[in-house]
Amino acid sequence: MNKITNFLILSAVLFFSLIESANAARLKDIASIRGVRENQLIGYGIVVGLKGTGDGKNEFMSKSMVRMLDKLGMKLDNVDFASKNVAAVIVTATMPAFGKAGNPIDINVSAIGEASSLQGGTLLQTPLRAANEQVFAVAQGSIVIGGDGKDSHTTAGRIPNGATIERDMTADFSSRKMYRLTLINPDFTTAARSVLTINKELGGHYASAKDSGTIDIITPFAYENRGVELLATIESIEINPDMKARVVVNEKTGTIVIGDKVKISRVAISHGALSVKVGDGKKGAEEKVAVLDSGVSVGELVQALNKLGVSPKDLITILQSIKSAGALHGELEVL
């Protein structure tokens, strides 16, 4: 008898452990390390080689071409430069964290003048600057536009590996005395669980939560000058993140996304020929009746209403009414 009891207890422990591990997420997927971030770059450039789809006669474009040719050693004084084969563009790119000089990055090119298409154009050498106005990359190359060029959006395109990083993004992460994690979705429960799990993994009280979204980690002596290894260890730790009970509905598309913790109290709703009862209730003479137990989830309610053929629009209206009545326990976000 004892063996059977022990077996059942062990089976239950393993079952719930599997459930927890199925919901677990790595810290690297729910948090970011302060200082490890991408940087946006932007620049103004000129596209040439267009087949009559450029800006044409434009004072702004004319001055840009004269200035560009002047840098190439061609002096053009009082020249009104007009061509339908060139276009003024804005070039944008995202520089990855720890990007190094010589590494290529993709760029986006968008027309800002009267050009009708950038198809077949070539971007001339364009410096890309960060928010501090320092040049971090230089772009150049042939523009690629998706699709067949007829029905696609031809005033914007991409150049894969079209820019080369010219300056390193410097940051020393190997010898820091403290690191800071920022939760992508701040939550006190998730922060507390993260601290407990990190301290258990590191074998001491090294992590502490400053608020619902900030966790500070003191570098253990065993990881001194080994910050990369420490962060790799922390990133791989699995946490069961908590989340608010929330229902998100999109009225335009009829899409409904429901969190697993959203519950509904006892409530009765009449919507046209439809009657919805959550809690004590029996089917009456209504044309369409849905009777559910008190404390059911929104998912169970939606499933029951779907069986009755309720349209997405009516579903959203019913959920909004339940929320207004105070019977829906969670946030209702309408997009």
Swiss-Prot record:
Keyword Signal: yes
Assigned GO CC terms: bacterial-type flagellum basal body, distal rod, P ring; outer membrane-bounded periplasmic space
GO molecular function: structural molecule activity
Superkingdom in the source lineage: Bacteria
Gene Ontology biological process terms from the UniProt entry: bacterial-type flagellum-dependent cell motility
Compartments, as annotated in UniProt: Periplasm; Bacterial flagellum basal body
Signal peptide segment: 1-24
Key words, A-Z: Bacterial flagellum, Periplasm, Signal
Protein purpose: Assembles around the rod to form the L-ring and probably protects the motor/basal body from shearing forces during rotation.
PANTHER family: FLAGELLAR P-RING PERIPLASMIC PROTEIN FLGI, FLAGELLAR P-RING PROTEIN
Complex and partners: The basal body constitutes a major portion of the flagellar organelle and consists of four rings (L,P,S, and M) mounted on a central rod.
Family: Belongs to the FlgI family.
Full protein name: Flagellar P-ring protein
The species this protein was found in: Bdellovibrio bacteriovorus (strain ATCC 15356 / DSM 50701 / NCIMB 9529 / HD100)
Gene behind this protein: flgI
